[in-house]
Amino acid sequence: MTNIRKTHPLMEIINNAFIDLPAPSNISSWWNFGSLLGICLILQILTGLFLAMHYTSDTMTAFSSVTHICRDVNYGWIIRYMHANGASMFFICLFLHVGRGLYYGSYAFLETWNVGVILLFATMATAFMGYVLPWGQMSFWGATVITNLLSAIPYIGTDLVEWIWGGFSVDKATLTRFFAFHFILPFIIAALAMVHLLFLHETGSNNPTGILSDADKIPFHPYYTIKDILGALLLILALMLLVLFAPDLLGDPDNYTPANPLNTPPHIKPEWYFLFAYAILRWIPNGLGGVLALALSILILVLVPLLHTSKQRSMMFRPISQCMFWILVADLLTLTWIGGQPVEHPYIIIGQLASLMYFLLILVLMPMASTIENNLLKW
């Protein structure tokens, strides 16, 4: 008799995706982040659901309701901090997952890669709207500054901003709709993640060498299930260390002050995972230019497959490209640091150089390095 997991219509889908899936025998720990992102998403949806049971999306009571969750709700404090720091873990996994894709040439799977870029955008939108919900000073001013960027769009900018706000300033209507979107988007992300997996399973996974691995495949279970469980345990360990020992390490003290439209904080800045994009935004003094640079800083990922000039897929055997990749990583860390600094000398010039370097590396230097390597290998 055939096993039920191979015959039952629902079980068959799960079986083909997580049990009998043929996987390359040599995929390293860098391939763990897909499953870790799935765990992060489930964790965020569950903690978010319990938070939503006690949260009120009204300007008068939002801040108080978050305080109430932390003080009065049973284990409310741990749910709140798991949700806030879970977002940080989510983005750490996201950045490492994208970095893995860039390094090993996983972007050659066009559909998978493009759905991944959409997922990145959706996750960033969700995180931004979530940051507004506690209605602290940084929530309010972050929402005001970031939504106001759209006013730089010619002709329709001002109307667009007021339409998003639901009025003439960030107010009750804005908070209510942000809560609604923040609640629905993770489910859209979950659906997109399934599409992401669907496209991936059409081609099969890439591997560190970038060479076709059809000749050497192993079943996903038990080899990669046990490997993913180890990754999950390490992720949960890191998250709980953060939640239980330094829950406010990555937050902003300003967000413990209730929102006040009459008092602007000295330094308005987003959460750490948006700082690199925020630095690129501030790089161009012109409003529209900054907004375009901000959008392009993420959209540029769509161009990466078109800019691939190497005859090899992975960077595993390409030392010059490896150098370029790690310079890009250092550049992004520099941008993250600059994004959190005030707009004054020497930070302005460092930010401008780092932003210029970011676009130069992806658009010019990395394709050039690949071409040089091709010539060195007489390809």
Swiss-Prot record:
GO terms for biological process: mitochondrial electron transport, ubiquinol to cytochrome c. Heme b b566 binds at H97, H196. It holds the Pfam family Cytochrome_B. One of its GO terms (cellular component) is respiratory chain complex III. One of its GO terms (molecular function) is metal ion binding. InterPro entries: Cyt_b/b6_C, Cyt_b/b6_C_sf, Cyt_b/b6_N, Cytb/b6-like_sf, Cytochrome_b, Cytochrome_b_C_euk/bac, Cytochrome_b_N_euk/bac, Di-haem_cyt_TM. Keywords: Electron transport, Heme, Iron, Membrane, Metal-binding, Mitochondrion, Mitochondrion inner membrane, Respiratory chain, Transmembrane, Transmembrane helix, Transport, Ubiquinone. Binds 2 heme b groups non-covalently. Heme b b562 binds at H83, H182. CDD domains: cytochrome_b_C, Cytochrome_b_N. The cytochrome bc1 complex contains 11 subunits: 3 respiratory subunits (MT-CYB, CYC1 and UQCRFS1), 2 core proteins (UQCRC1 and UQCRC2) and 6 low-molecular weight proteins (UQCRH/QCR6, UQCRB/QCR7, UQCRQ/QCR8, UQCR10/QCR9, UQCR11/QCR10 and a cleavage product of UQCRFS1). This cytochrome bc1 complex then forms a dimer. Component of the ubiquinol-cytochrome c reductase complex (complex III or cytochrome b-c1 complex) that is part of the mitochondrial respiratory chain. The b-c1 complex mediates electron transfer from ubiquinol to cytochrome c. Contributes to the generation of a proton gradient across the mitochondrial membrane that is then used for ATP synthesis. Belongs to the cytochrome b family. This is Cytochrome b. It comes from Alcelaphus lichtensteinii (Lichtenstein's hartebeest). The lineage of its organism: Eukaryota, Metazoa, Chordata, Craniata, Vertebrata. The gene is MT-CYB.
